[in-house]
Amino acid sequence: DEHGVDPTGTYHGDSDLQLERINVYYNEATGGRYVPRAILMDLEPGTMDSVRAGPFGQLFRPDNFVFGQTGAGNNWAKGHYTEGAELIDSVLDVVRKEAESCDCLQGFQITHSLGGGTGSGMGTLLISKIREEYPDRVMLTFSVCPSPKVSDTVVEPYNATLSVHQLVENADEVMVLDNEALYDICFRTLKLTTPTYGDLNHLVCACMSGVTSCLRFPGQLNSDLRKLAVNLIPFPRLHFFMIGFAPLTSRGSQQYRALTVPELTQQQFDAKNMMCAADPRHGRYLTASCMFRGRMSTKEVDEQMLNVQNKNSSYFVEWIPNNIKSSVCDIPPKGLKMSACFIGNSTAIQEMFKRIGEQFTAMFRRKAFLHWYTGEGMDEMEFTEAESNMNDLVSEYQQYQDATAEEEGEYDEDEDDEGGDYA
């Protein structure tokens, strides 16, 4: 939509800016047809069939649909070790093919869920394989975590914990999403009575588009995935971000709000706008990044960022001064004058890991459902490792939430302990 490409891949836009960097996400095929550089993989054919039958079915390259026949049955071990491992080579072939057609490959964007078997098990397998082959490229994931109240399957805590274990090691940036938080935004802010998955996806799209807008359109203050990582990750393991988007308004109340930089700033820092089930008011921001789109002055953006930090200084750790990065892209999304996308690295994300960890422990103590995983060749040790890795992550977040600028000196010598001793 933003680039003026219709569902058959033909360009129908009205501005050269749409085409200027269209190659970031599209390959140009014969007859001026634009093909997205996307690979779709699953362990069962059903989802692919529905994509093919959907409105954008003709857009994707048929070779880039890679699927198995069996399905992972919500089993992480099947996705990561047995079924997924059989399919992964054919996926990697397609990845190589796509990577070779890039002039300057910056990184990979992966969208997957952490609750099921394929997205979590095979998704993390793909991430680790890509990591082996392209160690210096940015690995950005959009990971849909199990929601606190809504649960599709009973083994979600297992799959999610095993996945987080992998994401801590192999991903560079993880944008944490959560269906329930997305539902709440649709329900409360957008006033939709019965939100569909389409509505939820629309919110995620707005964010994905915001994160990558600077790669695709010219701007005054550019940013890319690598700059994002450099500015948002103070310690390599703490790369789980919450994302938000502004302006989100219901259809009826649009004309009551002004689209100004202060208004956008206020809305994107609003806790109700976060797309994952963690409340930033319960923690502190280590860093944050605001990506504005539209015609606005960079001076105004900088003033607002300073303003936020001065007024809410207790919500930002004091040992990282000016920890909000901002970028400005000139072209707003379709149908809006200006918009903003927010990415925050907040210690409050530990709430989510804590919650999953508690659910994990409750089941793992009784070895519930474990035979499904051991039957695929997994070892109980892996579960224990994943559990302790997640607990370490939580205590690291807690440690940096409590750390003050004065205490830094005492901690320097035992930094290597991964925050285990004084959590």
From Swiss-Prot:
Binding locations of GTP: E44, S113, G117, T118, G119, N179, N201
Entry similarity comment: Belongs to the tubulin family.
Residue numbers binding Mg(2+): E44
Region (Disordered): 394-423
Gene Ontology molecular function, alphabetical: GTP binding; GTPase activity; metal ion binding; structural constituent of cytoskeleton
Biased composition (Acidic residues): 404-423
SUPFAM superfamilies: Tubulin C-terminal domain-like, Tubulin nucleotide-binding domain-like
Needed co-factor(s): Mg(2+)
InterPro entries: Beta_tubulin, Tub_FtsZ_C, Tubulin, Tubulin/FtsZ-like_C, Tubulin/FtsZ_2-layer-sand-dom, Tubulin/FtsZ_GTPase_sf, Tubulin_C, Tubulin_CS
Cellular localisation: Cytoplasm, Cytoskeleton
Keywords in alphabetical order: Cytoplasm, Cytoskeleton, GTP-binding, Magnesium, Metal-binding, Microtubule, Nucleotide-binding
Superkingdom in the source lineage: Eukaryota
Gene Ontology CC terms: cytoplasm; microtubule
Function: Tubulin is the major constituent of microtubules, a cylinder consisting of laterally associated linear protofilaments composed of alpha- and beta-tubulin heterodimers. Microtubules grow by the addition of GTP-tubulin dimers to the microtubule end, where a stabilizing cap forms. Below the cap, tubulin dimers are in GDP-bound state, owing to GTPase activity of alpha-tubulin.
Predominant location category: cytoplasm
Any one Gene Ontology BP term: microtubule-based process
Assembly information from the UniProt record: Dimer of alpha and beta chains. A typical microtubule is a hollow water-filled tube with an outer diameter of 25 nm and an inner diameter of 15 nM. Alpha-beta heterodimers associate head-to-tail to form protofilaments running lengthwise along the microtubule wall with the beta-tubulin subunit facing the microtubule plus end conferring a structural polarity. Microtubules usually have 13 protofilaments but different protofilament numbers can be found in some organisms and specialized cells.
UniProt-recorded name of the protein: Tubulin beta-2 chain
Sequence intervals crossing the membrane: none
